[in-house]
Amino acid sequence: MTTNTFTDPPVEMAKERGKTQFTVRDVTNFLNGGEEETQIVEKIMSSIERDPVLSVTADYDCNLQQARKQTMERVAALSPYLVTDTEKLSLWRAQLHGMVDMSTRTRLSIHNNLFIGSIRGSGTPEQFKYWVKKGAVAVKQFYGCFAMTELGHGSNLKGLETTATYDQDSDQFIINTPHIGATKWWIGGAAHTSTHCVCFAKLIVHGKDYGTRNFVVPLRNVHDHSLKVGVSIGDIGKKMGRDGVDNGWIQFTNVRIPRQNMLMRYAKVSDTGVVTKPALDQLTYGALIRGRVSMIADSFHVSKRFLTIALRYACVRRQFGTSGDTKETKIIDYPYHQRRLLPLLAYCYAMKMGADEAQKTWIETTDRILALNPNDPAQKNDLEKAVTDTKELFAASAGMKAFTTWGCAKIIDECRQACGGHGYSGYNGFGQGYADWVVQCTWEGDNNVLCLSMGRGLVQSALQILAGKHVGASIQYVGDKSKISQNGQGTPREQLLSPEFLVEAFRTASRNNILRTTDKYQELVKTLNPDQAFEELSQQRFQCARIHTRQHLISSFYARIATAKDDIKPHLLKLANLFALWSIEEDTGIFLRENILTPGDIDLINSLVDELCVAVRDQVIGLTDAFGLSDFFINAPIGSYDGNVYEKYFAKVNQQNPATNPRPPYYESTLKPFLFREEEDDEICDLDE
């Protein structure tokens, strides 16, 4: 059987691949950070693909309980790597497998990143060693979860109501859930798996509240998995996505833990009840920053998968055409289809640059903090600088997490729509991918709240700059004097395609926005308290976060291109220009308001985006092949490497739904009685009357 009267998709795909004008491997190495990194990635992907337990080809038809069991089997298969992998290998493995199996990624990350990350970052070296000996890292007779969110509070850490009250007589903390609103909620791993949790609770000593701190609390007995005395746990059940994650609720009733179970790298409680607080509370939130940084990288990895599917399909799918043409037109050749997908491909590449920059900053800041002794007066200046950098990273990671996870959600759904009806099939991945993904826009900080937090941080950094104080590198441009201002003559075409101009245009827009908001804040705070003043500026704070994050992605993209091989630079530059100019289209108002561009410039930018889409069009297969994804990781027949989309799609549907019986299992019980029912007042309608 032929698949189409007018086209042979595999032949079409081969022709498209032949249009590539660069060495695909060079772009792959550029994205991964070099040939050595690419080889590491390929080895990890190969090991995942060869393990039958990790196969995801039949996942789309799993029910809730099957997904839970299957995910646990995969956790067991991957857990040995938690001990043998280096930090870098562990990160790669999690991100790569997480592209196609977000549930397993989540269950492992909750333990490894959030639980272990909290103990490593907020505990003393001695505490970390203690829990390692207990089996925490090896995941033997031990599984951890992260008990932060409550039924009544999520993003507001200061508002959490679980209490940890110090009992000096027993040298223990007593953990309590004071009311139903303080129930720990949405806790991944709690319902079935976890033996311990890192619990966020209010530290109460001698009747005084010292704020939210972290405590390691045993949940289940190791020998039989029964609940500890005073611990109540339930299953939250069916969610929108990530069915393989056993999210649960936890309540504590007078649960006693040793004083040493409080993580005391920063805040400390002595056996006599003396509390020593850290220089900055944000130092205790390292696990949250790590989670956000990971989500920025995940945004890139998940986006690249769905863009590969949509663009490969677009290069072989023909639909409609001009009159008299014997062949229908490839949908990738429709200008509007290019407009829908190619700026998103450029966005995906920009995400990678932002993710790498965030990861680098996180590692450097964390290493510097872990090397400091908070109690050493000689390190006071270094600690203060680390505090400033941590505050900036806390805010910056919030904004980046928000806008990249939103961006990925947009990419998944736009790619789904761009694949027409076939994008709605469960076997092409978009439905489960979207349902599994969008929780990223909510957990570890609701995106809108995070943007407001970042906007607040940007204003505070601007105040630091105005006072001549230290700020982190990524915000220093706000203090620069250079700026772009129109004289009414418009901007030449070559300037609109200049990386230097585009970077400075975004920095000017962001700088002006932040400084204007800072001026308004300084006026408001004369009559309002700081919190009220910031609330009055909520919309402005959001806009500050949006433009600052976009300029950061653009700046990072252009800076990274400078390190690329000469043969791929022109193609990467087209992507960067496309992303920057499309981003201006997305925020035209601010560039006009700030007198950076004229209405005529905007018209020219619209034309340049069209031109860049045409220029990138022939390279889309090479640019997506550079992601290095085999059909296993694509896991969608319409995105197959060889372009044989119809035969593979048809085969997949029939493999999962074999035509064994033309009658449904509910024929006798439901369908037959319905079809052969008798109506008491069955009258024939005479249409001629």
From Swiss-Prot:
Enzyme Commission numbers on file: 1.3.3.6
The record's Gene Ontology biological-process terms are:
fatty acid beta-oxidation using acyl-CoA oxidase
> What UniProt keywords are attached to this protein's entry?
FAD, Fatty acid metabolism, Flavoprotein, Lipid metabolism, Oxidoreductase, Peroxisome
Does the keyword section mention Membrane?
no
Q: Which reaction does it catalyse?
A: a 2,3-saturated acyl-CoA + O2 = a (2E)-enoyl-CoA + H2O2
Its pathway, per UniProt, is: Lipid metabolism; peroxisomal fatty acid beta-oxidation
Q: What is its main location?
A: other
| GO CC terms | peroxisome
Q: Which residues bind FAD?
A: 149, 188
Self-association state and partner proteins as the record states: Heteropentamer composed of five different subunits.
Q: What is this protein called?
A: Acyl-coenzyme A oxidase 1
